[in-house]
A protein has these predicted regions:
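Soluble catalytic domains of membrane acyltransferases
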Residues: 11-170, 175, 183-186
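Helix-enriched interaction subdomains in cytosolic or periplasmic regions
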Residues: 1-4
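Active-site-proximal loop/hinge segments within enzyme catalytic domains
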Residues: 178
Length: 186
């Protein structure tokens, strides 16, 4: 297939080094941080294609109009019905039951802007679906992107977030001033 070769060339042209391998688990919540630029999504898709990963993520259903819907679906997007009774967390947990192999990609900050807390959805989804969390990253300071460790949540949010914060502490976003603390709201 030619797409992984195109992705490799794009990474090279962008000056990026891809690190880490494929996850060793069949299902996981894959978080990508820090998220400070529109370019993050582009480079995440290039990395996904380069590595041959099937990563899915939610996109609000109003974005699924022709011809954008085809491009979104090809790249792993799942429409999120924001009007549906229940939460997006519930929809994500249900999605894990639909597939034998499933990686749900999320940006835990929930925005490209500075925020004081990460959204807790990734944590609640992983707990509810009983799957681990894979730590994905885009380190603009060192031009490295990839997948870090796989974390099995303990249920102790403080302990789990300390491990996650330790991993991301040396990673710099495209707009470092937009990076906030790595912690969940109470």
């Amino acid at each position: 297939m030619i797409l992984p070769h195109v992705a490799r060339i794009l990474l090279w042209l962008g000056g990026w080094t891809a690190v880490g391998g494929k996850p060793t688990v069949r299902k996981a919540v894959l978080i990508a941080a820090p998220h400070t630029s529109n370019w993050d999504g582009f480079w995440a898709i290039v990395y996904k294609v380069y590595m041959g990963l099937e990563i899915r993520w939610f996109v609000k259903d109003s974005m699924f109009w022709f011809p954008l819907n085809a491009l979104l679906r090809i790249n792993g997007a799942i429409p999120l019905d924001r009007k549906r009774a229940g939460s997006s967390v519930t929809q994500a947990i249900e999605a894990f039951d639909e597939f034998d192999d499933f990686y749900m990609g999320l940006a835990p900050e929930g925005t490209r802007s500075h925020t004081e807390f990460w959204k807790s959805g990734f944590y609640r989804i992983a707990e509810g679906a009983n799957v681990p969390v894979v730590l994905g990253f885009l380190d603009y300071g060192n031009k490295r992107l990839g997948l870090g460790p796989t974390i099995t949540l303990t249920g102790d949010r403080d302990q789990d977030m300390a491990i996650i914060e330790s991993f991301y502490s040396s990673i710099s976003g495209h707009h470092a001033e937009k990076m906030g603390p790595i912690k969940l709201s109470r």
